[in-house]
Amino acid sequence: NRTKTLINAALHGWEYEVRAGFSIGGTSPIPLPAEIRSINSYNPSLAISLEGNMTKWIEPTKKWGIVTGIRLESRKMKTDATVKNYNMEIIASDGGRLKGNWTGKVSTNVNNSYLTLPVLAAYKINDRWHMKAGVYASYILEREFSGNVYDGYLREENPTGDKVSIEGDKSAKYDFSEELRHFQWGVQAGADWLAFKHLKVYADLTWGLNDIFKKDFTTISFAMYPIYLNIGFAYAF
């Protein structure tokens, strides 16, 4: 039966758990480029994650192990910034596109969903505390990187090109969603605390190491990386 199966797995060094949590963070260039003069507002939005994973302890004392699993997660944020000579491609009212250097305000909405495979090394400090670190690979399922520009002007093609003003109650949209990479990867590190016999509290930091945009996308002139802290609860079988 199910109980005997779990006991037998534990005797052979296997552990299983399911996790549910939320992520706080953002997608950002590191460091902030000179074009971004100030961050006026930031909203992490509600980003949920669900995960099933398994740990294989690889020596008799169960100090060291390997963890892998599958995680369904979202990475979100909303920001508003003031920029100068920021590369931009806006969508005009007639559906056409204007490309150039934007000076003014930029609002950004990031809302992406991923299927993620972590591969981590685990170290058991004691019966309650576990540390984990390793790498992850993510495949994007749903993608959005869009927003508006307002209270400023666009210099077409280059910083000295024709000036297109967007001021007052006017704004223009941009949408780079189709330019997001399908595959992303990075590093992950975190800790678990066993609060009760089967219930854990965990915190994991993930840091992307490749640009979220495709290699041939040049409108945004700097790389952007997803950096998120995931906090939640786990049930250990």
Predicted regions and their residues:
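Cleavable N-terminal export/targeting peptides
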Residues: N1-L11
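Outer-membrane beta-barrel channels and translocator barrels
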Residues: L11, T55-T61, N126, F196-H198
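Extracellular/periplasm-exposed beta-strand and loop segments of Gram-negative cell-envelope proteins
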Residues: G26-S45, R75-N112, I140-Q184, Q188, ...
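Detector for outer-membrane/organellar transmembrane beta-barrel domains
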Residues: W57, G65, Y114-T160
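Repeated loop/turn-to-beta-strand initiation elements of outer-membrane beta-barrel proteins
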Residues: K62-I66, R128-M131, K197-A203
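Outer-membrane beta-barrel "beta-signal"
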Residues: W193-L194, Y225-F237
